[in-house]
Amino acid sequence: MKAFLVALLISIELALVFAGCPTIISKNRWGGQQARKVEPTTKPLKYVIINHTSGPSCVDEIDCSRMLVYIQNRHMNHLNYNDIGCNFIIGGDGQIYEGAGWQAAASHTPGWNKKSLLIGFIGDYEINRPSLKQLEAGKQLIECAVERGEIEQDYKLVGARTIRQTNSPGKYLFRELQSWKGFTRDP
């Protein structure tokens, strides 16, 4: 009985600690495959990297799920990644979708995968502006990661273009990131 009460109290405390975390649509729900292999990371991570998919956006869960299945297939079958390349992906609908998740290193930039959390935004933000819903979801996800101990309190936030040759996350999203907590051009 005592062990049950202790477990119950711990569960309640964890629920309160993570109460600020947004809803994350599971990989299973959007139709994703399981990872071929999980490369673990050492927590807390120092970096949060933001990229974009540089393709069309999506407007609802059905549309975003279809795009994620396509992206995951491309990443796993053509780029030989273990999973979809991002830890989490934010759709044009403002919802957060599980990618590789909290426990696995993403597949995006050699030398950075095991020390960063990669958040992707579905869409092309070189030509389009991200929605306010997407931007808020990104900020909430980062706050959640801090609360969970997944990233350091004094994390560094970078656009993918800061660490490799790419236009990602697009000029409009990159411009927005510059006002976010932790943003740096010099990781």
Swiss-Prot record:
Q: Is Nucleotide-binding one of the keywords?
A: no
List where this protein forms a coiled coil.
none
Glycosylation: residue positions:
51
One Pfam assignment? Amidase_2
Detail the disulphide connectivity of this chain as listed in its UniProt entry.
Answer: 21-144, 58-64
Q: Where can this protein be found?
A: Secreted
Q: Where is the signal peptide?
A: 1-19
Q: GO biological process: any one? A: innate immune response
Is Disulfide bond one of the keywords?
yes
Instruction: Kindly state one GO CC term assigned in the UniProt record.
Output: extracellular region
Chief localization: secreted
InterPro entries given in the database record:
Amidase/PGRP_sf (IPR036505), Amidase_domain (IPR002502), Peptidoglycan_recognition (IPR017331), PGRP (IPR015510), PGRP_domain_met/bac (IPR006619)
> What keyword terms does UniProt attach to this protein?
Disulfide bond, Glycoprotein, Immunity, Innate immunity, Secreted, Signal
Q: Which GO terms describe its molecular function?
A: N-acetylmuramoyl-L-alanine amidase activity; peptidoglycan binding; zinc ion binding
Which segments constitute the N-acetylmuramoyl-L-alanine amidase domain? 43-170
Concerning its family, UniProt says:
Belongs to the N-acetylmuramoyl-L-alanine amidase 2 family.
Its biological purpose: Peptidoglycan-recognition protein probably involved in innate immunity by binding to peptidoglycans (PGN) of bacteria and activating the prophenoloxidase (proPO) cascade immune response. Binds to 1,3-beta-D-glucan and PGN.
Q: This protein is called what?
A: Peptidoglycan-recognition protein 3
